[in-house]
Amino acid sequence: SCMKAAPMKEVSIRGQGSLAYPGLRTQGNLETLGGPNDATRGLTSLADTFEHVIEELLDEQQVIQPSKENKDADLYSTRVMLSSQVPLEPPLLFLLEEYKNYLDAANMSMRVRRHSDPARRGELSVCDSTSEWVTAAEKKTAVDMSGATVTVLEKVPVPKGQLKQYFYETKCSSKGYAKEGCRGIDKRYWNSQCRTTQSFVRALTMDNKKRVGWRFIRIDTSC
Protein backbone atom coordinates (compact mmCIF):
# COMPACT_ATOMS: atom_id res chain seq x y z
CA SER A 1 0.00 0.00 0.00
CA CYS A 2 1.10 3.55 -0.57
CA MET A 3 1.38 5.75 2.48
CA LYS A 4 -0.93 8.76 2.40
CA ALA A 5 0.79 11.48 0.43
CA ALA A 6 1.46 14.75 2.22
CA PRO A 7 3.01 18.11 1.28
CA MET A 8 6.80 18.01 1.39
CA LYS A 9 7.01 20.97 3.76
CA GLU A 10 4.59 19.48 6.27
CA VAL A 11 5.59 15.83 6.53
CA SER A 12 8.87 14.04 7.16
CA ILE A 13 9.29 10.45 5.96
CA ARG A 14 10.11 7.71 8.51
CA GLY A 15 11.33 4.25 7.63
CA GLN A 16 9.73 1.47 8.92
CA GLY A 17 3.50 -34.22 -2.31
CA SER A 18 0.72 -33.88 0.21
CA LEU A 19 -0.60 -30.53 1.24
CA ALA A 20 -3.29 -28.85 3.30
CA TYR A 21 -4.66 -25.39 4.08
CA PRO A 22 -5.41 -24.78 7.79
CA GLY A 23 -9.06 -23.82 8.20
CA LEU A 24 -10.09 -24.55 4.59
CA ARG A 25 -13.43 -26.34 4.07
CA THR A 26 -15.00 -27.32 0.78
CA GLN A 27 -18.45 -28.62 0.02
CA GLY A 28 -20.04 -30.32 -2.97
CA ASN A 29 -18.40 -30.84 -6.35
CA LEU A 30 -18.25 -29.18 -9.72
CA GLU A 31 -21.37 -31.04 -10.83
CA THR A 32 -23.49 -29.84 -7.89
CA LEU A 33 -22.19 -26.30 -7.50
CA GLY A 34 -24.34 -24.96 -10.30
CA GLY A 35 -27.66 -26.04 -8.78
CA PRO A 36 -30.66 -27.88 -10.31
CA ASN A 37 -31.20 -25.42 -13.14
CA ASP A 38 -27.88 -26.12 -14.86
CA ALA A 39 -29.36 -28.87 -17.04
CA THR A 40 -31.75 -26.41 -18.69
CA ARG A 41 -29.25 -23.66 -19.27
CA GLY A 42 -27.42 -25.39 -22.07
CA LEU A 43 -23.72 -25.06 -22.70
CA THR A 44 -22.25 -21.95 -21.04
CA SER A 45 -18.94 -20.31 -21.79
CA LEU A 46 -15.87 -21.44 -19.85
CA ALA A 47 -15.42 -17.96 -18.40
CA ASP A 48 -18.99 -17.79 -17.04
CA THR A 49 -18.70 -21.29 -15.57
CA PHE A 50 -15.41 -20.39 -13.90
CA GLU A 51 -16.97 -17.24 -12.42
CA HIS A 52 -19.92 -19.21 -11.06
CA VAL A 53 -17.72 -21.83 -9.39
CA ILE A 54 -15.57 -19.15 -7.77
CA GLU A 55 -18.61 -17.30 -6.43
CA GLU A 56 -19.90 -20.54 -4.89
CA LEU A 57 -16.55 -21.15 -3.21
CA LEU A 58 -16.48 -17.59 -1.92
CA ASP A 59 -19.98 -17.99 -0.46
CA GLU A 60 -18.81 -21.14 1.34
CA GLN A 61 -15.71 -19.39 2.65
CA GLN A 62 -17.79 -16.59 4.19
CA VAL A 63 -19.11 -19.11 6.72
CA ILE A 64 -15.69 -19.42 8.38
CA GLN A 65 -14.65 -15.78 8.13
CA PRO A 66 -14.35 -13.81 11.41
CA SER A 67 -17.31 -11.60 12.35
CA LYS A 68 -17.43 -8.19 10.71
CA GLU A 69 -17.86 -6.71 14.17
CA ASN A 70 -14.27 -7.71 14.93
CA LYS A 71 -12.08 -4.73 14.10
CA ASP A 72 -9.24 -7.09 13.13
CA ALA A 73 -11.38 -9.21 10.79
CA ASP A 74 -9.90 -7.65 7.68
CA LEU A 75 -6.42 -8.66 8.86
CA TYR A 76 -7.06 -12.38 8.58
CA SER A 77 -6.15 -14.38 5.50
CA THR A 78 -5.17 -17.92 4.56
CA ARG A 79 -1.58 -17.77 3.35
CA VAL A 80 -0.30 -20.82 5.21
CA MET A 81 0.17 -24.24 3.62
CA LEU A 82 1.28 -27.52 5.13
CA SER A 83 3.17 -29.47 2.49
CA SER A 84 5.92 -32.02 1.99
CA GLN A 85 7.49 -29.83 -0.71
CA VAL A 86 7.61 -26.20 -1.82
CA PRO A 87 4.19 -25.20 -3.26
CA LEU A 88 4.29 -24.35 -6.96
CA GLU A 89 1.38 -21.88 -7.02
CA PRO A 90 -0.15 -19.18 -4.79
CA PRO A 91 -2.73 -20.36 -2.21
CA LEU A 92 -6.22 -21.05 -3.55
CA LEU A 93 -8.00 -18.57 -1.30
CA PHE A 94 -5.49 -15.89 -2.27
CA LEU A 95 -6.44 -16.34 -5.93
CA LEU A 96 -10.16 -16.34 -5.08
CA GLU A 97 -9.77 -13.15 -3.05
CA GLU A 98 -7.94 -11.43 -5.90
CA TYR A 99 -10.62 -12.52 -8.36
CA LYS A 100 -13.45 -11.39 -6.06
CA ASN A 101 -11.88 -7.95 -5.65
CA TYR A 102 -11.56 -7.74 -9.41
CA LEU A 103 -15.26 -8.55 -9.92
CA ASP A 104 -16.37 -6.15 -7.20
CA ALA A 105 -14.38 -3.32 -8.77
CA ALA A 106 -16.83 -2.97 -11.64
CA ASN A 107 -20.52 -3.76 -12.07
CA MET A 108 -20.46 -4.96 -15.65
CA SER A 109 -20.86 -8.05 -17.79
CA MET A 110 -18.24 -10.81 -17.87
CA ARG A 111 -17.25 -9.86 -21.40
CA VAL A 112 -16.65 -6.24 -20.39
CA ARG A 113 -14.70 -7.39 -17.33
CA ARG A 114 -12.37 -9.45 -19.47
CA HIS A 115 -11.69 -6.55 -21.80
CA SER A 116 -11.22 -4.15 -18.88
CA ASP A 117 -8.38 -6.25 -17.45
CA PRO A 118 -5.69 -3.78 -16.20
CA ALA A 119 -3.05 -5.80 -18.06
CA ARG A 120 -4.88 -5.12 -21.33
CA ARG A 121 -5.07 -1.38 -20.64
CA GLY A 122 -1.41 -1.03 -19.72
CA GLU A 123 -2.11 0.02 -16.13
CA LEU A 124 0.62 -0.18 -13.49
CA SER A 125 0.43 -0.67 -9.74
CA VAL A 126 1.11 2.30 -7.47
CA CYS A 127 3.72 0.18 -5.67
CA ASP A 128 5.60 -2.82 -7.08
CA SER A 129 5.55 -5.98 -4.96
CA THR A 130 6.92 -9.51 -4.96
CA SER A 131 5.32 -12.67 -3.55
CA GLU A 132 6.93 -15.98 -2.63
CA TRP A 133 6.61 -18.99 -0.36
CA VAL A 134 8.92 -18.94 2.68
CA THR A 135 9.52 -21.67 5.24
CA ALA A 136 9.40 -21.51 9.02
CA ALA A 137 13.15 -22.09 8.95
CA GLU A 138 13.51 -18.78 7.11
CA LYS A 139 11.08 -16.92 9.38
CA LYS A 140 12.32 -18.45 12.68
CA THR A 141 10.29 -16.03 14.84
CA ALA A 142 7.18 -13.89 14.51
CA VAL A 143 4.96 -11.58 16.58
CA ASP A 144 1.60 -12.93 17.74
CA MET A 145 -1.65 -11.04 18.41
CA SER A 146 -0.64 -10.24 21.99
CA GLY A 147 2.60 -8.65 20.80
CA ALA A 148 4.81 -11.46 22.08
CA THR A 149 7.61 -12.96 20.01
CA VAL A 150 7.08 -16.66 19.34
CA THR A 151 9.11 -19.34 17.57
CA VAL A 152 7.59 -20.57 14.30
CA LEU A 153 7.84 -24.36 14.14
CA GLU A 154 9.21 -25.71 10.90
CA LYS A 155 7.29 -29.01 10.90
CA VAL A 156 3.74 -29.99 11.84
CA PRO A 157 3.03 -33.58 12.99
CA VAL A 158 0.38 -35.46 10.98
CA PRO A 159 -0.84 -39.09 11.21
CA LYS A 160 1.61 -40.31 8.56
CA GLY A 161 4.63 -38.22 9.48
CA GLN A 162 5.37 -34.50 9.32
CA LEU A 163 4.60 -31.63 6.96
CA LYS A 164 6.47 -28.35 6.65
CA GLN A 165 4.81 -24.99 7.22
CA TYR A 166 5.00 -22.60 4.27
CA PHE A 167 3.96 -18.95 4.31
CA TYR A 168 2.98 -16.98 1.21
CA GLU A 169 4.46 -13.53 1.82
CA THR A 170 4.07 -10.37 -0.25
CA LYS A 171 6.35 -7.39 0.24
CA CYS A 172 7.49 -4.27 -1.57
CA SER A 173 9.98 -4.94 -4.32
CA SER A 174 13.54 -3.96 -3.49
CA LYS A 175 14.10 -3.05 -7.13
CA GLY A 176 12.60 -0.51 -9.43
CA TYR A 177 10.16 2.19 -8.47
CA ALA A 178 9.67 1.38 -4.77
CA LYS A 179 12.77 3.32 -3.68
CA GLU A 180 11.57 6.46 -5.46
CA GLY A 181 8.12 6.59 -3.82
CA CYS A 182 4.66 5.73 -5.05
CA ARG A 183 4.09 5.63 -8.79
CA GLY A 184 1.91 8.48 -10.03
CA ILE A 185 2.71 10.90 -7.18
CA ASP A 186 4.21 14.23 -8.25
CA LYS A 187 7.57 14.26 -6.44
CA ARG A 188 7.89 18.03 -6.87
CA TYR A 189 5.10 18.65 -4.36
CA TRP A 190 4.54 15.44 -2.42
CA ASN A 191 6.47 12.91 -0.42
CA SER A 192 5.33 9.28 -0.68
CA GLN A 193 6.66 5.90 0.31
CA CYS A 194 5.82 2.31 -0.58
CA ARG A 195 5.86 0.13 2.51
CA THR A 196 5.14 -3.49 3.33
CA THR A 197 2.07 -4.12 5.48
CA GLN A 198 1.24 -7.20 7.53
CA SER A 199 -1.77 -9.39 8.34
CA PHE A 200 -2.47 -12.22 10.77
CA VAL A 201 -2.34 -15.88 9.77
CA ARG A 202 -2.70 -19.03 11.88
CA ALA A 203 0.48 -21.04 12.39
CA LEU A 204 1.95 -23.65 14.73
CA THR A 205 4.27 -21.85 17.13
CA MET A 206 6.02 -22.17 20.50
CA ASP A 207 6.15 -19.42 23.12
CA ASN A 208 8.96 -18.60 25.55
CA LYS A 209 7.51 -21.09 28.06
CA LYS A 210 7.88 -23.93 25.55
CA ARG A 211 4.11 -24.16 25.05
CA VAL A 212 3.25 -25.33 21.53
CA GLY A 213 -0.01 -24.30 19.91
CA TRP A 214 -1.76 -22.68 16.95
CA ARG A 215 -1.55 -18.90 17.18
CA PHE A 216 -2.21 -15.94 14.90
CA ILE A 217 1.08 -14.34 13.85
CA ARG A 218 2.00 -11.41 11.63
CA ILE A 219 3.49 -11.97 8.17
CA ASP A 220 4.09 -9.64 5.22
CA THR A 221 1.02 -9.66 2.97
CA SER A 222 0.97 -6.54 0.78
CA CYS A 223 2.79 -3.46 -0.44
From Swiss-Prot:
Pfam families assigned to the protein according to its UniProt record, in alphabetical order: NGF
InterPro entries (alphabetical): Brain-der_neurotrophic_factor (IPR020430), Cystine-knot_cytokine (IPR029034), Nerve_growth_factor-like (IPR020408), Nerve_growth_factor-rel (IPR002072), Nerve_growth_factor_CS (IPR019846)
SMART domains reported for this sequence? NGF
Disulfide bridges in this chain? C127-C194, C172-C223
Q: Glycosylation annotated at which residues?
A: N107
The answer to whether the entry has keyword Secreted is yes
Under Gene3D superfamilies, the record lists: Cystine-knot cytokines
- Gene Ontology CC terms: axon; dendrite; extracellular space; synaptic vesicle
Q: Does the keyword RNA-binding apply?
A: no
Provide any one GO MF term from the record: growth factor activity
Give the coiled coil ranges: none
Which positions make up the signal peptide? 1-5
Intracellular or extracellular location(s): Secreted
- Keyword field: Cleavage on pair of basic residues, Disulfide bond, Glycoprotein, Growth factor, Secreted, Signal
> What Gene Ontology terms for biological process does this UniProt record contain?
cell surface receptor protein tyrosine kinase signaling pathway; modulation of chemical synaptic transmission; negative regulation of neuron apoptotic process; nerve development; nerve growth factor signaling pathway; neuron projection morphogenesis
- Propeptide residue span(s): 6-114
General function of this protein: Promotes the survival of neuronal populations that are all located either in the central nervous system or directly connected to it.
Question: What is stated as this protein's family in its record?
Answer: Belongs to the NGF-beta family.
Query: What protein name is recorded for this chain?
Result: Neurotrophic factor BDNF precursor form
* The encoding gene: BDNF
